[in-house]
Amino acid sequence: MKKYSLPKLALIPLIIFILSGLFFLQYRIDYLRRGPDSNHTNLAPLEVIPNVLLGSFRGVLVDLLWIRGIARHEEKKFYELLAINNMIAKLQPHFPAVWIFQAWNMCYNIAFEWESPENKWRWVKAGLDFAEKGAVRNPTNGDLLFEIGYIYFHKFDSKSFKYADHYRERLEEETGKNSYRQSLYWVKKSLNYNSLLRKRIVIERTVCHILWHASLQAEKDGKQEEAYEYATESIKEWNAYLKRHPDDPGGIARDFLEKINEKMLELEQKV
């Protein structure tokens, strides 16, 4: 039985047509991922060149890297996973979900796998460094900015994590930064931009909660004046919140104001 096939020369235009279609499809996907407020000038030349050369094949390579990364995580080969994460980020620098997911994975999932506080800290710091690098490439993405601030708040809070005190000490030793001030910086900064993952009112309340937790921690550490200052800032933020939202959804603002004012009376006697 005679087999019929397309002439080899006829396949060339077909291949070119398919590759062209993939290229424009990838371009559209990239545009939608980046959004209209992206800053595309924050890439190093070594990051731009691979993206240009790979063209439409970049998406395929990224998918393969994600699969490889999941495998390395399951095998607990975390340092290989870190290298893969960096490669994915270079190929998708303006896709904030990449930075958010990988930062959380390092700060929470991978850090959890280690026993010693110091090893846990290394991965918490690696995750934050990774996320902040992403913020340089996506300076107007409210979601990424908020997540960085929330990690500084949640991961370093003694009520949430056993080794939070160690993390705060190591952060100040290595960077000179205060976790609560860092958290406030990033969360407040996120309010300047659109956020798809959280409502603005939730972010505003988070600022108030950070200040309240900072006050409680300072009091616990014996820093009464600092605790008083944080409590004062928290009251100021809650009052500003009530001016913007006089209906006080959930009815929590006034309850917190009452609680913080009571704490301030206690602190006044200690200062």
Short names for language-model regions:
Residues 1-7:
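Short, Lys/Arg-rich N-terminal segment immediately upstream of the first membrane anchor
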Residues 26-138, 146-237, 245-247:
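Short coil/linker segments at helix-helix boundaries
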